[in-house]
């Protein structure tokens, strides 16, 4: 073999060996940098899981493989120990570890029966009985509304499991009509089957991951399909987390805008001042006033409000209302005369209907 061909062959061999050892690029699969936080990894998985789910891509022969790669990437990068091993040794360093079902990972975010693509509730077959839905209020802070968050909820869920023997049931949904009198009828379900497998309800602990999206509004609901009350003859209902934004001690939310009040001294109101307001994510909003600030004056800081739920790139305003703290102690006659001389302002005593703007 010529030296040049031998060199090319060796380089190709080294490349193939490196590829085998390295395995799949989990960061590339999730579309995140190697410095990505756990929050970024969860957001990326949640977004891609909806796009790549095989049920949503029935015509793609590689859909199942892509979905499995996505689940494997999330399982490793969301676990600090596995991620450390992967960063050091590649996928080969994880071969001896336990791997979760990718369906389990998906249900961790969306529920047992997956996410209803298109955002519409699942269509219920009227012939299949269904357990009750459960609605749970989930309290979130204004800080979480601003920046988003992932909240883990541990739920003890009764699950129908097979039990020995048979049971009587109404799986065929047959009805009996009984006439009670003229124009009065009663319909009852008829138990016509005694051959169905027996079932029992067993409590199982499940950990669900609720994504608090930036800009989420009070009263919005996050559904987890099949995580509601079970039904021994059918399918379980749904679990819905209803967002309840708790009050904040500094900011008040109105739509995408934030409101707050700032109290300044009389001296600051007259001569000006500078100050910083600590925002919900810790960054500072600088305020500088070099003119007179009257009680009730408002200052708009555009882009310093909450992110819009539908488009996080758009943010509302921060509206600051100023209050003036007047001195508590009484002024001396000399001080009063000094103020009169300084301000050179005569009496202004006007009586009017302020509510009408006159």
Curated annotation (Swiss-Prot):
Q: Name one GO biological process term.
A: mRNA modification
Q: Where is the signal peptide?
A: 1-22
SMART domains per the record? Answer: DnaJ
What does the UniProt PTM comment say about this protein?
A: Contains high-mannose Endo H-sensitive carbohydrates. Cys-169, Cys-171, Cys-193 and Cys-196 form intramolecular disulfide bonds. The preferential partner for each Cys is not known.
A single GO molecular function term of this UniProt record = unfolded protein binding
Q: Briefly, what is this protein's role?
A: As a co-chaperone for HSPA5 it is required for proper folding, trafficking or degradation of proteins. Binds directly to both unfolded proteins that are substrates for ERAD and nascent unfolded peptide chains, but dissociates from the HSPA5-unfolded protein complex before folding is completed. May help recruiting HSPA5 and other chaperones to the substrate. Stimulates HSPA5 ATPase activity. It is necessary for maturation and correct trafficking of PKD1.
Keywords for this entry? Answer: Chaperone, Disulfide bond, Endoplasmic reticulum, Glycoprotein, Phosphoprotein, Signal
Location relative to the cell: Endoplasmic reticulum lumen
- Subunit field text: Part of a large chaperone multiprotein complex comprising DNAJB11, HSP90B1, HSPA5, HYOU, PDIA2, PDIA4, PDIA6, PPIB, SDF2L1, UGGT1 and very small amounts of ERP29, but not, or at very low levels, CALR nor CANX. Binds to denatured substrates in an ATP-independent manner. Interacts via the J domain with HSPA5 in an ATP-dependent manner.
Question: Which InterPro entries does this chain map to?
Answer: DnaJ-B11-like, DnaJ_C, DnaJ_domain, DnaJ_domain_CS, HSP40/DnaJ_pept-bd, J_dom_sf
Q: Does the keyword Chaperone apply?
A: yes
What's the protein called, per UniProt?
DnaJ homolog subfamily B member 11
Glycosylation sites per record: 261
Domain J per the UniProt entry, residue ranges = 25-90
Spell out which residues are annotated as carrying Phosphothreonine.
188
What the entry lists under Pfam families is as follows: DnaJ, DnaJ_C
Q: Which GO terms describe its cellular component?
A: cytoplasm; endoplasmic reticulum chaperone complex; endoplasmic reticulum lumen; extracellular space; nucleus; protein folding chaperone complex
